[in-house]
Amino acid sequence: MRFTLSWLMQYLDTDASLDFIISKLSDIGLEVDSVDCKKHLQSFVVVEVIDVVPHHAADKLKVCQVYDGVQTFQVVCGASNVKVGMKSVLAYVGSVIPKNQTVIKVAKLRGVDSYGMLCSRDELGITENDSTDEGIIELSDNTYNVGESFFSCDPVIELNITPNRGDCLGVYGIARDLAAAGVGKLKSVNFCDITFDNTCYISPIEICLEVQGVVKGVYIKGIRNCETPKWLKEYLFSCGVKSISCVVDIINYIMLSFNRPLHIYDADKIAGKLVFRKIDDQIEFFALNDKKYLLGKENIIAVDLANRIHSIVGVIGSEYSKCLFDTENIFLECAWFDPVDIALSSRKIKLSTDSSYRLERFVDPEFLQDGLKLATKMILEYCGGSPSSIVSVQNYVHNDILLNFSPDSVRNIGSVSITRDEIFDFLCNIGCVVKNHDCDIWIVIPPSWRSDLKHSFDLVEEVLRLYGYDKILENPIPISNIEFPDNLHNKLRSVLLSQGMMEVVTWSFTNLEFAKKFGYDSDIMLIDNPINNNMNLMRPSVLLNLLQVISENQAYGNNDAAIFEIGQIYNINSVCGDNNYVVSGVRYGDNLPRNFYKTDRSVDIFDVKSDFFKVLQEMNIGYDSVDLVRSTKSYLHPMKSADVYFNNILIGYFGELHPSIVHLYEIKRPIVCFEVFLYKIPVVDLTRKEFVELRYQSVKRDFAFLVSKNVNIQCLIEVAKKTNVQLIEDVSIFDIYEGNGIDKGMLSVALSVTFRSVDHTLNDQEIKDASDLIISAISKGFNGILRSC
């Protein structure tokens, strides 16, 4: 919401400084986004052209002498419309042109010095929709004075208004809030004094209302849609609103001043009656912004007896019946509709306008008559015309809300002592009607423009807001001497950061179509009201979002990445309070940056296997406590992935992504990933192994077995370990080979076995017996054949 300081002062009687007003706005919850004092526009002044001569060396250039009320400047100009006696706008040397940010300097054009520039509307950033001017701006004699600043240098304040404070989307509402907080007094606007002297006929246009709402209208004939007054143009320009025509600018002014959207129709284009109804079927609509929209059942339209659509109600009017400069007869509409209906209608066509933005945040339903009267009065004043009587149709009744309010609740909730009289004044200042204020329980009726005051504690908040949050004394929380252990998530973050990964935080939403490619087509949680079409599902896996991050990083030229996220996943069985946390990680590209040691390589399954077991290790789960099973997940590579089970419960997986998924995200290199389901892992007590001093020498023996390619290597290792747990200290694989010399379908698996006794040195026979047990177990369990060479 943007407005000027002088605009605010139209409704607020105060001597407060700009700085104080800005500070107070923030104090009462109206966040000040910016304040523009327009110092950069002070160097654009109104001048009179007093002499024009052709340039001696350029046919299209003219040498002009312009007067700013103090001195004369020589300016070289190429505009065809420059002439003696005209008023225009001079940009002094050092000025910055609004359109293109060009800095004006002293220039020599074909040998002639030029001290400034005469500006066009386009260069000043004020091009009007119907403007055909191609030369410099020509100002009317009686509106602008030579020497004055062309732009209003009135400070412009911009506020971020929260959705619940629609009443502050008008300057009058902001002034009302400041006055309630003690900044001056609110100037009254007596709408009842506005009368129509020439009202002597009934509107030829009738209204029919088939939806919930209230519609009022006035037919005005014989208007002259002239140029907008200077002061009104300046107000609109300060708010970033372009001047269209006097009639349109007036209703925009009413909307910005009083948060009261209105709409104007060319009455000659309406066939007899306006019917406000919802659409039965899809239909195309040509809007006044020169765009075409496909309307659906969510949209409310205004149609006439010829079935022509004249507006999407509360959103935008039609190209057919928009008000132009040659329009003579108009129908002025002022309406209130259900905010939900307006929001759905606006969202259907993906168009938000100043009108719909306000209507969907609730506008005052009791201000229709006054808003219509004020707009009509201004149109008659500046454009002339003869108004009809007001035509009105109502399909909604605004009922006052009665709130039982205890003044003691301010102290109980806000921990401040405010007198009953102060509380009474605060509530009255914001427009509330307070009854029974001599009793313990007051009956408070919120004003019609404050739809956010629905409960008694809302009134407490209002009192505290106006009293000042800064006056509430701090009550520091006592610091406890108890030291709490680090949170598990923080420990896991530290572990993965030490693995060279970076943490990311992504949305809890994901794309349904992508999720289906991962096999998530049941037990999923769809979003009825997604923020966009690509985020229409609560994520069943964090992996989907991480892959999107990788894809976007690749698009920006980042070809190596290792990222992780600790977050929640969701399914249809999730209930409020469920903490389905997972740790998910993705590696892509090379494991290290390029270096002269040539230690960089492409990441593989063993990188994420290390990450996975580092997480488990932090949760007191050792490698020997879990079972690895070849993964059956469709989005993982069938030969380079594993599911991990703990106590027969699936607690995660790791592996390389299936090439089809990599292609889906348009990623150029293989990706490895892991995901640990933290919510499935029970708390495992930390068990410390007793230290055993290794006093006796170990012995290593290597074995090479021929086994089928279908053998689970992990199971082979486990079988070898269990043959003699007292003597076998470790079993590891140091080579897997297939190719020349190995039968088809077979593998050569080489094991390194470490033998050690805790109480004596092993002799040859003990080592031989233990080796024979390994050979026998693998032969029986896997049909393994010991290779002789």
From Swiss-Prot:
InterPro entries on file: aa-tRNA-synth_II/BPL/LPL, B3/B4_tRNA-bd, DNA-bd_dom_put_sf, Fdx_antiC-bd, Fdx_antiC-bd_sf, NA-bd_OB-fold, Phe-tRNA-ligase_IIc_bsu, Phe-tRNA-ligase_IIc_bsu_bact
Reaction equations catalysed: tRNA(Phe) + L-phenylalanine + ATP = L-phenylalanyl-tRNA(Phe) + AMP + diphosphate + H(+)
Required co-factors: Mg(2+)
An example Gene Ontology CC term for this record: phenylalanine-tRNA ligase complex
Database matches in PROSITE patterns: B5, FDX_ACB, TRBD
GO molecular function, one term: tRNA binding
Top-level taxon of the source organism: Bacteria
One GO term (biological process): phenylalanyl-tRNA aminoacylation
Cofactor note: Binds 2 magnesium ions per tetramer.
Catalytic EC class: ligase
Entry-linked PANTHER family: PHENYLALANINE--TRNA LIGASE BETA SUBUNIT, PHENYLALANYL-TRNA SYNTHETASE BETA CHAIN AND LEUCINE-RICH REPEAT-CONTAINING PROTEIN 47
Protein name as annotated: Phenylalanine--tRNA ligase beta subunit
Naturally occurring in which organism (per UniProt): Ehrlichia ruminantium (strain Gardel)
Lineage: Bacteria, Pseudomonadati, Pseudomonadota, Alphaproteobacteria, Rickettsiales
Gene: pheT
